[in-house]
Amino acid sequence: MTRETSTLTTSPTETSPPETGKTETTPGSAHDPAAAVPLMERIGYGCGDLASNFIWQAMSIFIVYYYTDVIGVAAGIIGSIMLFSRVFDGVSDIAMGYVIDKTTSRHGKARPWLLWLAVPFAVSAVLLFAVPDVSPFWQTVYIAVTYNLVCLVYTGLNVPYGTLNSLITQDQYQRSLLNVFRMSLALVGVLLVSNLTLPVATLFGGGQGGWIVTFAIFGAIGTGLFLFTFKSTRERVQPADEKRRQAPVPLKQSLRTLGKNRYWALATLFILITYIFNALNSGAVVYYAQYLLDDTWLVGVITTAYIVFILAGMAFVAPITKRYGKRNAIIVGELITLVGYGVMLIDLGNVYLIVAGTIIRGLGKAPINGSMFALLGDTIEYGEWKTGIRNEGMVYSGGSMGIKIGSGLGTALLGWILAFGGYVGGGGEQSDTALFAIQALFVYLPMGLCALMIVLMLFYDLDKRYPAIVADLAAKR
């Protein structure tokens, strides 16, 4: 019987994971990785994703629109830049995960990166919008360089930020709570930037100057929030073997460990597809509101309806996932999302039906947002149980890679499909094929992705195995 199919209880005949896979637990102490995480620390952890969304989500929603309708760059060129950049950046995620696993400092292995890179992230975002008035070729070069710079710095922040969840606690329910706070505050960020970006840019004169000032403000806010996350969190989960702390696992061995972790592959692929969905949903809404509903201010209305009802649903995610499991909650959420799209399909030009369908989609998205990164965190213990190697940084690099490549593919699809449909930037009248392309981006493609994510989750059964895996690991300490 292979290790994969053997029972989880320890017996003399079974092959136990090497002792280097152990984790340190000091029951009853402030450093106990199974203890309840204090409320302020949950809030502080969640503020990290709020910080990211002041820049990253604002970019996801408006960057294609800014480049096509403010700067005047062709949509197809932007789509190609986005895809190349995100795929390249996905490779850097793996490298960053390895760097985190090797990091040793008095602040821990993940937290110090929040301190070191908060300011560079804000500066790089401002540079992204400061496109010089030069020839189209050099504008394209500038956009490619600055966009890759933003992605690279974001990697340096987001991989350690995601890893921090698994270093704060080893308890499955506490991780779910942290993820609920993370995604709830992330949604607050989405709500704020989707409603404030256009008005603030207009307030500061509109055009390129208004956008630069807007992102300078967002960058300053994001920097402060990242520093708050750094100050308010603690790393508690440590490898028990002192040699392991001083001599991290070689890169080749760490990559081989990921290859043996099928749940990591499923969770990473799920996150990737989710962020394709997110990029299409957030990027296409600007075009849908302007050209199908004839009012760009409806961007705020639609996005607000979506986010408010995701937040409302998030209040119930932790108890639901505790009782029924994260996988089952996600599947039900995807089905509810499909119902929301069904309501929208009744009349794709009716504002009320679009908003009603969006409200239903928001409720369905709550268990998805509230559970997907907790899914990834649980694969750390599975990998440790199966191989004896605990590599949080490498595992969470998969989540970051999924975000980057998924967002890049989604943004690239946005640009490519608009170009294929004959979209003409600048706010003019669009052809029927261009209007259908916008409908496909906002409705039809996301529906297909929902169905694909349901299929993926049918293969994820770690929820029911996790308690026995953790007990098996604890018995070997």
What residue ranges belong to the model's regions?
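Membrane-embedded alpha-helical bundles of multi-pass transporters/translocases
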Residues: T2-T15, T23-R477
